[in-house]
A protein has these predicted regions:
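Short, well-ordered alpha-helical microsegments
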Residues: 19-23, 106-109
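A generic structural signal for alpha->beta connector loops
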Residues: 9, 32-34, 64, 94-96, ...
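Short, glycine/charge-rich flexible loops or terminal/linker lids adjacent to PRPP-binding catalytic cores
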Residues: 20-67, 78
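Short glycine-rich phosphate-binding loop at a beta-alpha junction
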Residues: 7-15, 98-100
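Short glycine/serine/threonine-rich phosphate/pyrophosphate-binding segments
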Residues: 75-83
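PRPP-dependent phosphoribosyltransferase catalytic core
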Residues: 28, 82-154
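Short, small-residue-biased leader/transition segments that mark boundaries at the very start
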Residues: 1-3
């Protein structure tokens, strides 16, 4: 992060369920940060494709702040981009956004770079895998981050 980013108030934003453990890790470091939460999920279609549905947003003002959008997996990138748009619509434009993921795919990285404001977005991935399955899961990846943290959904 740039030192100027640290001069701004920090907001840690995450996508509910899968992102909560990652969110807590960032909050342990940025302990004075504000929080933002978004409920987003994949709505599968019969043909195997999906759309991302955003249903719940909880955030204060993002205007002029540094937002850390933390999502453990950046598969297609569409969830991160849609969540960013929803947060900006509700909370205003942050001065800078850092998207942080543990694992991304080449497709997800490319999508975020094309669909989020280039001048005010930084993307951080610990690893970038080359491949997605036909269901848009990262290969080899780590599996479903939410299921790993909380157990399989019923």
């Amino acid at each position: 992060m740039c030192s100027s980013d640290l001069d701004n108030e920090i907001v840690i934003a995450t996508i509910l369920r899968a992102g909560l453990p990652f969110h807590q890790g960032f909050l342990n470091y940025f302990d004075d940060a504000q929080n933002a939460f978004v409920s987003a999920y994949r709505k599968s279609k019969k043909d195997g494709t999906f759309t991302v549905k955003v249903e719940y947003i909880s955030c204060g003002s993002l205007e002029g702040k540094t937002m850390l959008l933390v999502d453990p997996m950046l598969a297609t990138g569409s969830s991160a981009a849609l969540v960013y748009e929803a947060l900006v619509e509700k909370g205003g434009m942050p001065a800078h956004t850092h998207v942080a993921s543990i694992i991304g795919s080449e497709q997800g990285v490319d999508y975020v770079q094309r669909h989020m404001p280039h001048a005010t977005t930084s993307l951080w991935c610990a690893a970038v895998d080359e491949e997605l399955t036909s269901r848009s899961y990262i290969v080899p990846g780590i599996g479903d981050a939410g299921d790993l943290a909380y157990g399989e959904k019923l």
